[in-house]
Amino acid sequence: MNLRLILRIARTELAVLFYSPVAWLLLVAFTCQVGFDFMNILTEIVKIKALGNTITFSVTAGFVLGLKGIYEVIQETIYLYIPLLTMNLMSREYSSGSIKLLYSSPVSSVQIIVGKFVSMVVFALIFVVILALPTIVMFISVPHVDITLILAGLLSMFLLILTYCSIGLFMTTLTSYQVVA
């Protein structure tokens, strides 16, 4: 496989993705959701301390895991964001007719799919960076932060987002209609 062609397809796909307002709106909505969830968890911890109770659990584990942990809450809603990104990946090529140009060019179908998936990997990294921002605040405010727990949570969220992206990419190859994909 020619890596330059794959990266060119990925760069073009990212440019098309960021020219549309959908990607920007999803990033803003995801950032707001992460911020609200972070503040809810922080409020619960402050309430426990204000009542005079001692925190018997690891603050890092309570922040990251648990029933109200930030990764748990984001994991429950991340599936709503990914289909809005992946529905255009291949169906746009089918509906505009540019798939015929791609097939006639010296690019294999595997390179097309891998290039589009690489663009989704970059977008998933942006999601993970946004999700990592509250951990920076945690490093400042929480003593004895368990870094392995945080990194494992971020890695699991990254892999979950990539799983949803691969499912979305597969679904968009089946039809030329964006809504169906």
Go through each PLM region and give its residues:
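Perimembrane helix-loop junctions in membrane proteins
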Residues: I41-I48, R92, S96, P143, ...
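Secretory targeting signals
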Residues: V34-M39, S58-E76, G115-V180
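Alpha-helix N-cap/helix-start motif at helix boundaries, enriched for small hydrophobics
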Residues: V110-V114
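Transmembrane helix boundary and interhelical loop/hinge segments in multi-pass membrane proteins
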Residues: P83-Y103, F117
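Cytoplasmic juxtamembrane interface segments
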Residues: M1-F18, M90, F158-A181
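Hydrophobic alpha-helical transmembrane segments
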Residues: M1-Y81, L85-N88
